Amino acid sequence: MESQRNILLIGLLFVSFLLWQQWQTDNAPQVAAPQTQVKSHVSAETSSDVPEADGSVSTAVVASTNLINVTTDQLVIKINPLGGDIVYAALVKHKTEIDKNDPFILLEQSSDFNYIAQSGLIGRDGIDSSTKGRAQFTTTSSDFSLADDQDKLTVPLTLVTDTGVRYTKVFTFTRGQFDVGVDYQVNNTSDKSLQLQMYGQIKQTIKPTEGSMMMPTYRGAAFSTSDVRYEKYDFEDMADMNLSKSTLGGWAAMLQHYFVSAWIPPATDANTIFSSVSAGGFANIGFRGAVYDVAPGSEQSISAQFYVGPKDQKALSAISETLNLVVDYGFLWWLAIPIYKLLMIFQSLVTNWGIAIILITLTVRGLLYPLTKAQYTSMAKMRNLQPKLADMKERFGDDRQKMGQAMMELYKKEKVNPMGGCLPILLQMPIFIALYWVLLESYELRHAPFMLWINDLSVQDPYYVLPLLMGVSMWLMQKMQPIAPTMDPMQVKMMQWMPVIFTVFFLWFPAGLVLYWLVGNLVAITQQKIIYAGLEKKGLK
């Protein structure tokens, strides 16, 4: 019964952790989103979207021009020639729903929601400004596609000013990748030097975070600088104070469950990461790059990278050494990362995420077996001492000091550690929470099937079979546990109801996590039988 209480304690602590986390979300002040009138289904940004050199940003929405369509093996992109902003991005190989073929739309502009990536040239001679307006580019075609025999696709947008300066904004797409190169090629054929500064920002309508108690998710901004490797900056933070951080390199991003968009300026440039909340209910986060002086008769390239896709840790790490931190495992990241890597190894061997979860459960339980055995042995010794402890209670009555001293002497004589059953709990709890965050944050498990009716391990079991089996396994474990004679009858009654209570809680857990708990219970039952058989041979029950 002590072991059952320990397991239930782990679960209760975990559920309490989730309840506290959800309370934090539910009681956080909400950022008010002012309403705005939108006149067209697809819209573009006016000159008021452009950040000034001092970092101020404002937004407005007006009618759009025709868009440039780009299709690769991973992305469907739409670019507005007014400014060259990315106003639509769909992920070809990631579906909106598991039973539909519609690609997942990450960036979009509609009458009620805007989520776009803007970039331009500002500074003294910038072609994008809040007073003169956005650059109006032209292009040779309105449709670009990555051919089967191509590894790269370039989409050039061109602008020639009245003074003869030629600006070419080139978008570069690479097969199999979600990052987009954005490069300004400036050919200064005028007789004056130019002072230019690139900016990139992500603009999103402030939208409440969606999620449940068992699957809390974050929707908001994040950034990285030379001083801060990774920090979330949610809509409430952005409303309270505009961000302005000087840094070498760095990045600015918008996050949501499983997906991210991010601007990554050159790592060796002096940049400023900034944010704002503007009229119309828009949140903006981005960077202002280094200032370039382009002499008459010279050429200059000014570039940055933009990522729009899943939270693929390998792909993100290849772009920036800290960008993979958007896969946020919380305070137990140091434990979650090796669990994730081990899970990836198992999945590569068996090519089934459900079986990989089973294998990692067996591994964790196997590593903890020596501690589990020590726990059961300690509890068995404690049960055998109950008659002697009862005698002490009668002998010493209310004299707690003498009672405590006698108990310590008895424990020392019998070589029993009364806290011996606690260590496995202290180890299992962080492992369980870390694995929970791995299953919650790892995009690889989105729409990942297991077998039979489980076609998505990242959501709850649609027929609640796994939670019911988990409840049965907890009941079996309970039946296997000896009941201490000194246990209060009311406490025994409460313990008997725990499998039912936990079954109800687990109805809304992701199927992958319930699978982990179920398999863990089955392994624990097997380990109990083995350990108890060994203890009986030693005269311990």
UniProtKB/Swiss-Prot annotation:
Where this protein primarily resides, as one coarse class? membrane
Keywords on record:
Cell inner membrane, Cell membrane, Chaperone, Membrane, Protein transport, Transmembrane, Transmembrane helix, Transport
Lipid bilayer topology: Multi-pass membrane protein
CC annotations in GO: plasma membrane
Q: Name where it's found.
A: Cell inner membrane
An example Gene Ontology molecular-function term = membrane insertase activity
Q: Which InterPro entries match?
A: Membr_insert_YidC, Membr_insert_YidC_N, YidC/ALB3/OXA1/COX18, YidC/Oxa/ALB_C, YidC_ALB_C, YidC_periplasmic_sf
Question: Per its UniProt entry, which superkingdom is the organism in?
Answer: Bacteria
Which CDD domains does this chain map to?
A: 5TM_YidC_Alb3, EcYidC-like_peri
- Matching Pfam families: 60KD_IMP, YidC_periplas
Any one GO BP annotation for this protein? protein transport
Q: TM spans, by residue?
A: 6-26, 342-362, 420-440, 457-477, 500-520
Q: What does the sequence similarity comment in the record state about its family?
A: Belongs to the OXA1/ALB3/YidC family. Type 1 subfamily.
Q: What does this protein do?
A: Required for the insertion and/or proper folding and/or complex formation of integral membrane proteins into the membrane. Involved in integration of membrane proteins that insert both dependently and independently of the Sec translocase complex, as well as at least some lipoproteins. Aids folding of multispanning membrane proteins.
- Assembly notes: Interacts with the Sec translocase complex via SecD. Specifically interacts with transmembrane segments of nascent integral membrane proteins during membrane integration.
Q: Which NCBIfam families match?
A: PRK01318.1-1, PRK01318.1-3, yidC_nterm, yidC_oxa1_cterm
Q: What is this protein called?
A: Membrane protein insertase YidC
- Report the source organism: Shewanella denitrificans (strain OS217 / ATCC BAA-1090 / DSM 15013)
